[in-house]
């Protein structure tokens, strides 16, 4: 019995020393952020991480290739039919009967997806003016990059809100970086009107950002041919105007068919020569790239 007490006391003392030593050695290790994650301050402390953060926002753009259970978006129209898909989505798409349900992640998961992208845009717009320039960049080049990134963030945010509108109608417009531990609800208890959401915000964002974006040639030569360019802003502006002039939205938006036609004509006048249904080029890579872009 005496030996048991001695052994127990010994191991308790050893454990106490070990715990104390761990605390002395590692400090508040368990309370620290994972080493592979950067804080907001760290991201925007240098241009390299700021650039990576900004380009990552492009990942929130979606495409029609196999997006919904391996089905193509064209199969939801009269243009095509999906021959392979899982979960019964093929049939639903082909007969135009795809609807919101617990499994319809395209509809249910889009809310979080786009608000995450919107938050990244807000974070960039909040911080980028204070990011130091890269060592190899001149002051003039840095100012150009900042202007382009801000314009791209405004475009992406407008695009994300437009995609949300197509699924949910007007949703809360968040243009600040919300504090997860702060008041998240009091300023977003009412749904904005269609005019406030689309006309006063989305269309204004698209119109204002166009001047700061790259032109199409510069975008193609930048090494990132998918970068947002001026024609993209004007094209989306025209698309939104077309929706707003429709019978469904005209009474609330105040936009007429003539205004929508003028927006489309503006795109064709300024950018129409840059695009075509068929173009020729001696470089197969360029032909394929142009077919997509």
Task: Name every feature range the model reports, one short phrase each.
Residues 184-197, 249-252, 256:
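Structural transition elements
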Residues 47-48, 55-64, 87-168, 189-200, ...:
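Conserved, well-structured interaction surfaces
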Residues 22-77, 149, 196:
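Acidic, glycine-rich segments characteristic of secretory precursors and extracytoplasmic regions
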Residues 1-34:
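Bacterial Sec-dependent N-terminal signal peptides
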Residues 68-87, 137-139, 171-177, 214-232, ...:
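Short, surface-exposed recognition loops and adjoining beta-strand edges that mediate ligand/DNA contacts
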Residues 22-23, 58, 83, 114-117, ...:
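Long, intrinsically disordered, low-complexity segments
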Residues 235-240, 245:
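Amphipathic alpha-helical repeat scaffolds of TPR domains
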């Amino acid at each position: 019995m005496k030996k048991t007490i001695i052994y127990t006391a010994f191991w308790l003392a050893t454990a106490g020393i070990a715990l104390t030593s761990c605390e002395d050695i590692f400090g508040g290790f368990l309370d620290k952020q994972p080493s592979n994650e950067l804080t907001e301050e760290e991201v925007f402390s240098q241009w390299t991480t700021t650039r990576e953060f900004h380009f990552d926002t492009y990942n929130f753009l979606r495409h029609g290739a196999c997006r919904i259970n391996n089905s193509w978006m064209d199969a939801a129209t009269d243009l095509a039919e999906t021959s392979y898909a899982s979960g019964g989505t093929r049939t639903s798409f082909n007969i135009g009967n795809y609807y919101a349900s617990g499994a319809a992640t395209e509809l249910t998961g889009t809310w979080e997806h786009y608000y995450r992208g919107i938050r990244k845009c807000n974070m960039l717009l909040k911080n980028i003016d204070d990011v130091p320039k890269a060592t190899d960049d001149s002051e003039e080049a840095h100012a150009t990059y900042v202007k382009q990134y801000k314009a791209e963030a405004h475009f992406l945010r407008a695009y994300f809100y437009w995609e949300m509108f197509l699924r949910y109608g007007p949703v809360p417009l968040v243009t600040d970086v919300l504090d997860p531990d702060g008041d998240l609800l009091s300023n977003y208890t009412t749904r904005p009107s269609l005019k406030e959401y689309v006309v006063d915000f989305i269309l204004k964002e698209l119109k204002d950002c166009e001047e700061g974006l790259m032109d199409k040639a510069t975008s193609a030569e930048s090494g990132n041919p998918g970068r947002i360019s001026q024609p993209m802003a004007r094209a989306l502006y025209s698309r939104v105007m077309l929706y707003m002039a429709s019978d469904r939205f005209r009474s609330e938006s105040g936009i007429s068919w003539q205004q929508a036609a003028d927006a489309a004509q503006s795109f064709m006048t300024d950018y129409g020569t840059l695009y075509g249904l068929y173009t020729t080029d001696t470089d197969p890579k360029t032909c394929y790239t142009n077919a997509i872009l």
